[in-house]
């Protein structure tokens, strides 16, 4: 769910997920996939692609279990669909951490109207 995703992002980056990433670039937050503005925005693009492959779960409401072991996210639980969702969220949180050096505060709130459509496929 959004709650677990937020915790993962905070654990990996130390940033507030809602204010730092909620409307970042063209792909973070609600809406379809657009041409990414930078590496952080690409993390959100890839996350949407990952969610698109999910079946039998609702990424907004369904919750999964994970643990934080030696500063690493470990997805748990028996449900393969929820584990898959956890892996999508884990990948995005790690992607955000790996791209902290190019995070641009000016892109924290991007008007989606300024975003270009992309022909890039998942």
UniProtKB/Swiss-Prot annotation:
Residues 105-117 are annotated as: Important for membrane-damaging activities in eukaryotes and bacteria. Its main location: secreted. GO terms for molecular function: calcium ion binding; calcium-dependent phospholipase A2 activity; phospholipid binding; toxin activity. SUPFAM superfamilies: Phospholipase A2, PLA2. The keyword Disulfide bond applies. The record marks 105, 108 as: Important residue of the cationic membrane-docking site (MDoS). Pfam families: Phospholip_A2_1 (PF00068). The record marks 111 as: Hydrophobic membrane-disruption site (MDiS). Disulfide bonds join 26-115, 28-44, 43-95, 49-122, 50-88, 75-86. Expressed by the venom gland. Keywords: Blood coagulation cascade inhibiting toxin, Disulfide bond, Hemostasis impairing toxin, Myotoxin, Secreted, Toxin. GO terms for cellular component: extracellular region. The keyword Disulfide bond applies. It is found in: Secreted. InterPro entries: PLipase_A2, PLipase_A2_Asp_AS, PLipase_A2_dom, PLipase_A2_dom_sf, PLipase_A2_His_AS. The record marks 112, 117 as: Cationic membrane-docking site (MDoS). One of its GO terms (biological process) is negative regulation of T cell proliferation. Snake venom phospholipase A2 homolog that lacks catalytic activity. It shows myotoxic and weak anticoagulant activities. A model of myotoxic mechanism has been proposed: an apo Lys49-PLA2 is activated by the entrance of a hydrophobic molecule (e.g. fatty acid) at the hydrophobic channel of the protein leading to a reorientation of a monomer. Belongs to the phospholipase A2 family. Group II subfamily. K49 sub-subfamily. This is Basic phospholipase A2 homolog CTs-K49b.
């Amino acid at each position: 769910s959004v709650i677990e995703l937020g915790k993962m992002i905070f654990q990996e980056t130390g940033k507030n997920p809602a204010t730092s990433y909620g409307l970042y670039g063209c792909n973070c937050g609600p809406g379809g996939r657009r041409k990414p503005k930078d590496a952080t925005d690409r993390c959100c693009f890839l996350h949407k692609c990952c969610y698109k492959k999910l079946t039998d779960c609702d990424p907004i409401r369904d919750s999964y279990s994970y643990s934080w072991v030696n500063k690493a996210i470990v997805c748990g639980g028996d449900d393969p669909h929820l584990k898959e969702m956890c892996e999508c969220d884990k990948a995005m949180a790690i992607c955000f951490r790996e791209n902290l050096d190019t995070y641009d505060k000016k892109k924290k709130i991007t008007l989606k109207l300024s975003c270009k459509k992309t022909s890039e496929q998942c």
